[in-house]
Amino acid sequence: TVLVMQALQKKGNKALFVGGCVRNSLLKMPVTDIDIATDAKPHEIVSLAIDSGLKSIPTGIEHGTITIVSNNKTYEVTCFRKDIKTDGRHAVIEYSDDIEDDAKRRDFTMNAIYSTSSGIIVDPLEGLKDLKIRHVRFIKDPNKRIVEDYLRILRFFRFTSEYGDPNLGIDADGLAACAANIDGIKLLAKERIGAELKKILKTKNPSIVLAAMDRAGILSNILPGSSSKYVPILIHQENQNTINWITRLVVLGGAEPTKSLRLSNKESREYKYTLKAINLGKKPSVVAFEFGKDIALSYSLSLAALTETFLPDNLYDQIILGTSVKFPIEAKDLKNLQGKKLGDALRELKDLWIKSEFTLSKKDLLKNR
């Protein structure tokens, strides 16, 4: 980090940390990505990196962003800039020497706080005041910020869930602007919508923001037929279990989220198996045997939330049982059968064994043949 900052400031340019790394440092939360803003232009950033023996990658050079690699760690370095034209998805930018121009084009006040390499805070838009009370607020006019990129509607709810103070509630101006610009969501790629909803569902307790999204018509816009009603019940049931956003998505419901949110093959499989298990309504031990422990837990939590009932007391014993048993019959045990008849017989015996809650032995099962 020191090497990168020294390289950028080598010829008198300004370089400041900005965004998530500053916000999370001040909140004493983990920092993952490091973003740096500078008054150097793209070609100067590349030149300064080369002069200091650092690798540079032109990841978003047309938008003024260069990735610098130092000690196998990446740093996103972006020029001070201002938006000249936006279409709700992309922006035409112009470089600037003024940090305030750069701050004004960001989304929320808490994301427009800068820091020097020595830790001096530069706060052109008084974002620190909002950060201290955990108030997630758009910069200046919320409508203008949203029209610049409609994904900011979903980001507003995600940031409120992740960083907002629940006692403060949701910023009223921001919420009204999100509801007023709801049609803009249709302009966004499904992948972007899916990625942002996934992040919302991964926050510790998204109940409040999902209920607000539901009331504002935003949830039904991205997931027709969905409802936030059962999410608080699920979150209460989750208790000490690891948060699984797919389970929360199952409880939200809605038409074909695997397509409307562009889920990966792995995510789609997990979603469909959990839903299939709910529709079959089998015991957790059977679901664990057929689909594995993760699906069994997801199924049990979803079912308890949707039916507003408690989890079975012996849930974990059932899941352990289902994942540890092995069907005792193999094809070689039915030597007199072949092809379709063999397949049918194996299925029939397996159903019988499952119905016995895995108690029938090989000998017992073969007696039925």
Task: Describe the function of each predicted region.
Residues 1-369:
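Catalytic cores of the polymerase beta-like nucleotidyltransferase superfamily
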